[in-house]
A protein has these predicted regions:
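Transmembrane alpha-helix boundary and packing residues in multipass membrane permease domains
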Residues: 4, 8, 19-20, 56, ...
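Small-residue-rich hydrophobic transmembrane alpha-helices
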Residues: 32-89, 93, 126-145
Length: 194
């Protein structure tokens, strides 16, 4: 169960790391990152859970010895992940409307929108990773999935430090740097798994 927990919680861990670094950067940034991260995660999860369901079918077809069907259902999960991008982008105004309804201070809301927008732009990477991960976990090959997600989280820590505070040759970008770091790090696991 541990590899599955690691794989499904990778984005949560990355957003938590964002908040750890942002807490040392600005009180406004830390106030903005949590609600924006949770809201984006809520929208992304519909697509991620659906694409990740490919792993269930991979397990069934793997048990039946039908490798071709394993590849086919994984491909469907990948297509769904890619198709989620325009929907996630279309949900950005709805997210902004919800943030306005909540009524946080204007400076917090401005940073919430920055973080939320980046999470939504890169949101398709989460279902992409879950679909690819489902191919391996459905065949009880969880080691690669686990290591890929750990690598993604490690990349996020380094990029958060560099992009939030302006270290390692990067400009100081605050909350936007944290969001960009998480989007980049979200691409690591799928790239390793491919």
């Amino acid at each position: 169960a541990t590899p599955l927990i690691i794989g499904s919680s990778a984005l949560t861990v990355m957003q938590f790391c964002d908040r750890l670094f942002l807490a040392r950067h600005s009180s406004v940034s830390i106030q903005a990152a949590l609600p924006a991260g949770i809201l984006s995660f809520t929208f992304i999860c519909l697509f991620a859970a659906t694409a990740g369901y490919a792993g269930t079918f991979v397990a069934q077809y793997h048990g039946a010895g039908d490798r071709r069907q394993c590849i086919r259902v994984t491909a469907q999960g990948l297509w769904l992940a890619l198709a989620s991008l325009p929907f996630l982008l279309l949900l950005i105004p709805a997210g902004h409307a919800l943030m306005t309804l909540i009524g946080h201070a204007p400076e917090v809301m401005a940073e919430e929108r920055i973080y939320f927008d980046w999470m939504m732009r890169g949101g398709f990477l989460v279902p992409l990773g879950w679909a690819i991960g489902g191919f391996f976990t459905g065949q009880s090959r969880m080691r690669l999935n686990t290591l890929a997600n750990i690598a993604g989280a490690a990349v996020n820590v380094v990029l958060d430090y560099a992009m939030i505070f302006g270290r390692l040759g990067c400009p100081a970008m605050g909350i936007e740097g944290g969001a960009i770091a998480t989007v980049i790090a979200s691409a690591v696991a799928p790239l390793i798994q491919i």
